Amino acid sequence: MKKILLVMALALGWQQAAMAGFTEGATAYNNKNYAVALKEIRPLAQAGNADAEHLMGLMYYMGRGVPQDYKTALEWHRKAALKGKADAQYVVGAMYYTGNAVIQDHKQAVSWFRKAAEQGHPDAQQVLGLMYRYHIGGMPQDNVIAYMLWNLAAANGSMNAAEQRAAVVKTMTQEQIEEGQALSAGWKLNTPLPQKSRTGGG
């Protein structure tokens, strides 16, 4: 029992130290002190901390404190994305969408955007809505799902989503609008998003 408690205490101590190190690194990054950020963040990323992996990805993507390297950026973002980091999932989706450092693959982009969107990531919700609206990446054209996603993203502060919603609503029937409202009102965070609506297409 004492050994178990000791292991738990050591793990908790490491987590607290890691959090302190990440906070220092993130603060340095935001203050444009990239050398300090790299010193604090790299060991945490190498130890598998998802937040640090994501920040390392950003540093390589932007060329801040390290040479700009999109492939390395993708590797770090993917590590964090596989651990469930929504911001990283969004970036991986965007890189697949544009073909940046990877072969362009809209279906892969959809998969990553959906993972982030289901965690409430407003940019992922907004982009996924566009993919439904304009039938991208093998998505069915579905204005109701697009409206639902933009409703969610707008509620999370996305002005782009609010503008897209205002545009698409002009093309929708009252029945479609009501379904979109009901879908967004009934959806729960961290649950699967619907892939098609009842009243549907464009």
Residue ranges and their predicted role:
Residues 7-13:
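Bacterial N-terminal signal peptides
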Residues 1-4:
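Positively charged n-region of N-terminal signal peptides that target proteins for export
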Residues 21-28, 43-44, 55-62, 91-98, ...:
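Hydrophobic face of amphipathic alpha-helices that form TPR/SEL1-like repeat modules
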Residues 14-20:
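Sec/Tat signal peptide C-region and signal peptidase I cleavage site
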Residues 29-33, 46-53, 62-64, 69, ...:
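Short helix-capping/linker turns of helical repeat alpha-solenoids
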